[in-house]
């Protein structure tokens, strides 16, 4: 996406009173063994896009680990590359970098996420906490993953999944303990965003209808927040 395109899209969004909370970037979604210089240049462009959209967050990853190799063997290289991201990002202090736990990257389990964030020790980096992705890595989301990352969570992804087959479901219909996480976040004073995701949800009656899938996902979240937790829905 060019910056000229961004300005066009931004005008349309403004006309419809829509704002962008986060840029869902592909940064860090390459192999840890891939060349890095071009990717670092792309990262700067993503930051420029975020500025143009007035988005306070950029979602990122911590690199795919080669199959069959221990993720811990690449910890130092992951930290090195993220520190290079932060060196660029310091010129964009209004933007927070979000590390998403994604299957098969370095930070796909909470222990690695916590280790990375602790070593970076930078307030410009937070966790984008995704319950479904943890389930797909056979990780207990609550209390285990939440307790390890609760002080670093800056953004929530709302989707769920089953341990048995790793299929994604609407919130509350899987094993991701989404309601327990949301209750804990509220109790902990969380004031960030929650991004509702329909991607990956497989429900026969909706087939590939994106609008229907979003409605299903939205209704599932509304049930948790309004009916179960007594929160407002505006």
Enumerate the language-model features and the residues they cover:
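N-terminal substrate-binding region of glycoside hydrolase catalytic domains
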Residues: 1, 24-27
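Aromatic- and glycine-enriched glycan-recognition loops and surfaces
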Residues: 1-7
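Short, conserved glycine- and acidic-residue-centered signature motifs
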Residues: 2, 39, 74, 78, ...
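Active-site acidic/histidine proton-transfer and metal-coordination neighborhood
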Residues: 7, 12-15, 29-127, 136, ...
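Short phosphate-binding/catalytic loops that engage adenosine nucleotides
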Residues: 18, 95, 190
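Conserved beta-strand positions in the central sheet of alpha/beta enzyme cores
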Residues: 22-24, 59, 98, 154-157, ...
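Histidine-acidic metal/acid-base catalytic patches
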Residues: 54, 110-129, 135-234
